[in-house]
């Protein structure tokens, strides 16, 4: 509770700061004025004492001087303001830091709203290239003596050949690759959009994308390319079948890349779009609401497509045991809801001055009136009324817990609080705050009216003060009203597959206000036997002020319910109710403002606001589910790649970052690991699983194409001669493992049994450790002489570690430093290690040419509601669920 009390004082501190700043401005302006006067005096004295003669010509100079003085004073005041602004900003930053320390996942409100609204369906971005892991590259050929030939040869190599630094596990590379594919995985491919002209075509044909065109270009220009292939490239063009709405494009792809792109083409998420789908996309309650007039554009083309949003419910149950995460989600929902709740502007409310004047007359305030009655009018203004209206609806929409702020001696606040507790379900208030407010109402108004002793409430009592009072009060009307409040809960109703928290029908139609008024009338008629006459009169007048506005209160209750339920129709995630870590403060004086200033003007959300709210909710919910699917897929992949323990926290952190609204470093670790456990239980989505299986089946090909991943290492006690290789020159590389004793690296890491390997090495038998591991390339002859590869031997025999194993591949050829040492002296270089690596796949043009098929054309629409034109009836005619006007009191 300590930090809540600090929060209460914050406003006072801010006011003090503002006053101090004002004083500083005054002091600074005084100082600057004094400085100016001193400067002027100094200038005058200089002029008098100086012996120089001055010729005075005209008055224009004086005018210029005056202008300059004005300019300088303006500049000084600007500088002052800037200094003060920076001070204010600094103070805000300090307060923000203090707040961050108390709230685990706190984010500034404006940025949350922007982040929420910026979440767009990823489908909107067009895919302008095919997905590729490999690219063909020209590599030189070396002669037997290590000199480079003029000829080249084409091989398939990796486009992005990057490995995590300082890590044995090449499997991390595959996990990162999979993560990258999940990010880039297109929801649809329209080849017509990405097709580019084939420069070497005879008849202006097109190929599938720019990379295919550049590969064709490079091969066409290569001197060693056969004439048949050149003629084939010249004939490469698209084939259109207009009657079937199909087009075929030629592409140059590695077989694995072809498998990926074929999969993407055959598993597109686009679906045909028609008017019925758009009609059903609009929430049913808004479609059926007679206050909104919806018209639809009927001119949708047959090629229209859309991507169905992924709106699965409660897969992680973040409301259950994720206090910090749930607090952030409800906060962001609250800020979004506040931005869409309609404003009660001054013209929609009763004039504040006129209302206060009327209240003063009703109170018959005179000079001798007791202090408590003058408090009734304190803090009543239209801004507070509007703030209260927005807070109540937004808190219910986001299921944010509210806490009440009030002064016990202000009876008017407490009487307004009676209306608040009648209309808003108990669950919405912080338990301690609810108990304090109920206790104040009981001990200030209810018990004194009947002459009962003060209630002494025990902290931690399972019953609330109203529940205790309901059993003790004999008066039927008051007990009946207390009974209603004690049982005022949200009703959970599933509408269109979404769990909604709905209000009691008596609240929706405003009839509960009559029940409240009956109880208030009964209380005002009581004698208050143990209290002085002034006390009784104050309470009676407070009740009179509220009862005079019976009609307006009924209308206000109906208006509140209607706005809540209409906006609730746009919520797509289940409305789970759990008390939140932090609360939204609500001043009871602002509730009084709302009760006293509500007019007879109906305010309902505009259709554009509803559509905006619905779109933001759909986009967030869909993104949330897609990111869950990504995280579940990555966790499964990490498990199957034996990286399970290592990567888990970073996977969950990435998942939260991609949801946009979380301040991830502040999420407690226990919630991270609980989130991991929940994600682990979910099934992997089919597309993502198929993609991972494609990677798993082709790991060998990917390793072969990399310049940083070896497929094993051979270690010997004695030196082995470097061999000649066409791709590298002289190199310590093994293309096969025939004749070597083999040990699996994964087995060695898991068992930790190094006995077998050390015995073999000490008996002068070479050992081949088989498994993917990183290697480094060195082309320095000097370092080969220095035998740096001894470190590999030491890792195994002495340190008994393979997790940091990084063998060196020596490449000695005409491109190497000091190659003349080998060439001139017929020196035969040796090494105690050999890197096992198979030859990368040679590039064969005929085998790499694939025809890809897709629809000739279709148009994907992301904003379905843009086809709907909407309008509202005149607000005065707007009706509620019972077919009666929302506001009856005219």
Swiss-Prot record:
A Gene Ontology molecular function term of the record: RNA binding
Entry annotated with the keyword RNA-binding: yes
Residues carrying the site annotation Interaction with the intermediate capsid protein VP6: 232, 236, 849, 851
Domain of life: Viruses
Subcellular location: Virion
Entry keyword set: Capsid protein, Inner capsid protein, Repeat, RNA-binding, T=2 icosahedral capsid protein, Ubl conjugation, Virion
Span list, region Hydrophobic: 404-424, 432-452
Region described as 5-fold hub: 1-88
Polar residues compositional bias, start-end: 28-42
InterPro entries, per the entry: Rotavirus_VP2
Primary role: Inner capsid protein that self-assembles to form an icosahedral capsid with a T=2 symmetry, which consists of 120 copies of VP2, with channels at each of its five-fold vertices. This capsid constitutes the innermost concentric layer of the viral mature particle. It encapsidates the polymerase VP1, the capping enzyme VP3 and the genomic dsRNA, thereby defining the core.
Subunit: Homodecamer; each decamer is made up of two conformers of VP2, called VP2A and VP2B. Interacts with a VP1-VP3 complex. Interacts with the intermediate capsid protein VP6. Interacts with NSP5. Interacts (via N-terminus) with NSP2.
Family statement drawn from the similarity comment of this UniProt entry: Belongs to the rotavirus VP2 family.
Domain notes for this protein: The N-terminus binds RNA. It is necessary for encapsidation of VP1 and VP3. The N-termini of 10 VP2 molecules form a cylindrical hub underneath each 5-fold axis of the inner capsid.
Protein name: Inner capsid protein VP2
Record organism: Rotavirus A (isolate RVA/Human/United States/WI61/1983/G9P1A[8])
């Amino acid at each position: 509770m300590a930090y809540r009390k600090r929060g209460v004082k914050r406003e006072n501190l801010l006011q003090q700061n503002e006053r101090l700043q004002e004083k500083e401005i005054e002091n600074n302006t005084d100082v600057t004025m004094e400085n100016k006067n001193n400067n002027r005096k100094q200038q005058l004295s200089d002029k008098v004492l100086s012996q120089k003669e001055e010729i005075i010509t005209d008055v224009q100079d004086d005018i210029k001087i005056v202008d300059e003085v004005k300019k300088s004073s303006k500049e000084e005041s600007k500088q002052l303001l800037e200094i003060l602004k920076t001070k204010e900003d600094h103070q805000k930053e300090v307060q923000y830091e203090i707040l961050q320390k108390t709230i685990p996942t706190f984010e500034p409100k404006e940025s949350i709203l922007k982040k929420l609204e910026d979440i767009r369906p990823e489908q909107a971005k067009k895919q302008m290239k095919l997905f590729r892991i490999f690219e063909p590259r020209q590599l030189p050929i070396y002669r037997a003596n290590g000199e480079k030939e003029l000829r080249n040869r084409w091989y398939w190599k990796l486009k992005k050949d990057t490995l995590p630094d300082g890590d044995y596990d090449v499997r991390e590379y595959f996990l990162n690759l999979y993560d990258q594919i999940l990010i880039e995985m297109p929801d649809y491919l329209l080849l017509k959009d990405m097709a580019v002209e084939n420069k070497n075509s005879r008849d202006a044909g097109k190929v599938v994308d720019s990379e295919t065109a550049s590969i064709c270009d490079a091969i066409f220009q290569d001197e060693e390319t056969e004439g048949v292939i050149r003629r084939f490239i010249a004939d490469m063009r698209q084939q259109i079948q207009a009657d079937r709405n199909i087009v075929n494009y030629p592409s140059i792809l590695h077989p694995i890349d072809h498998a990926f792109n074929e999969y993407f083409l055959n598993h597109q998420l686009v679906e045909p779009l028609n008017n019925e789908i758009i009609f059903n996309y609009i929430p049913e309650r808004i479609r059926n609401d007679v206050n909104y007039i919806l018209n639809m554009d009927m001119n949708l083309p047959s090629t229209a497509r859309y991507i169905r949003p992924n709106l699965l419910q409660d897969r992680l149950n973040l409301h259950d045991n994720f206090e910090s995460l749930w607090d952030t989600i409800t906060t962001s929902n609250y800020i979004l809801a506040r931005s869409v709740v309609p404003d009660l502007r001054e013209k929609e409310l009763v004039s504040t001055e006129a209302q206060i004047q009327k209240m003063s007359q009703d109170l018959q305030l005179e000079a001798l009136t007791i202090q408590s009655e003058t408090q009734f009018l304190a803090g009543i203004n239209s801004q507070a009324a509007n703030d209260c209206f927005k807070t109540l609806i937004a808190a219910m929409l986001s299921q944010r817990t509210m806490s009440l702020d009030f002064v016990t001696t202000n009876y008017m606040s407490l009487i307004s609080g009676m209306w608040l507790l009648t209309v808003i379900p108990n669950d919405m208030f912080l338990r301690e705050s609810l108990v304090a407010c109920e206790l104040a109402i009981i001990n200030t108004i209810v018990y004194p009216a009947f002459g009962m002793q003060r209630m002494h409430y025990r902290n931690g009592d399972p019953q609330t003060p109203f529940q205790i009072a309901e059993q003790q009060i004999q008066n039927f009307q008051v007990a009946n009203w207390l009974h209603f409040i004690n049982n005022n809960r949200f009703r959970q109703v599933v509408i269109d597959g979404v769990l909604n928290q709905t209000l009691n029908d008596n609240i929706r139609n405003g009839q509960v206000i009559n029940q409240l008024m009956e109880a208030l009338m009964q209380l005002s008629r009581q004698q208050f036997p143990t209290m002085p006459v002034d006390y009784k009169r104050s309470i009676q007048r407070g009740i009179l002020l509220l009862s005079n506005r019976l009609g307006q209160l009924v209308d206000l209750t109906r208006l509140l319910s209607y706005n809540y339920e209409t906006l609730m129709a746009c919520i797509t995630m289940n409305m789970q109710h759990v008390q939140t870590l932090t609360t939204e403060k609500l001043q009871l004086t602002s509730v009084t403002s709302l009760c006293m200033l509500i007019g007879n003007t109906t305010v309902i959300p505009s259709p554009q606001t509803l559509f905006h709210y619905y779109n933001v909710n759909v986009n967030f919910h869909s993104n949330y589910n897609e990111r869950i699917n990504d995280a579940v897929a990555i966790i499964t992949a990490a498990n199957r790649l034996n990286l399970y323990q290592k990567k888990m926290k970073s996977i969950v952190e990435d998942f939260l970052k991609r949801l946009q609204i979380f301040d991830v470093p502040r999420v407690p670790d226990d919630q991270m690991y609980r989130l991991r456990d929940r994600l682990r239980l979910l099934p992997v989505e089919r597309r993502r699983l198929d993609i991972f299986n494609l990677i798993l089946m082709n790991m060998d090909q990917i390793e072969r194409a990399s310049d940083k991943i070896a497929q094993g290492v051979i270690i010997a006690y004695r030196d082995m001669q470097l061999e000649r290789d066409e791709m590298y020159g002289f190199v310590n590389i093994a293309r096969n493992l025939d004749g070597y004793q083999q040990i699996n690296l994964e087995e060695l890491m898991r068992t930790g049994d190094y006995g077998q390997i050390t015995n073999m090495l000490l008996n002068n038998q070479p050992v081949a450790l088989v498994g993917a591991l990183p290697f480094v390339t060195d082309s320095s002859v000097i370092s080969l002489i220095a035998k740096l590869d001894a470190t590999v031997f030491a890792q195994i025999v002495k340190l008994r570690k393979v997790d940091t194993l990084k063998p060196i591949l020596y490449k000695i050829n005409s491109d190497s430093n000091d190659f003349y040492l080998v060439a001139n002296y017929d020196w035969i270089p040796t090494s105690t290690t050999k890197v096992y690596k198979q030859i990368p796949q040679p590039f064969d043009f005929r085998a790499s040419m694939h025809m890809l098929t897709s629809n000739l054309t279709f148009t994907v629409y992301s904003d379905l509601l843009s086809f709907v034109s909407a309008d509202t009836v005149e607000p005065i005619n707007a009706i509620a669920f019972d077919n009666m006007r929302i506001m009856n009191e005219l």
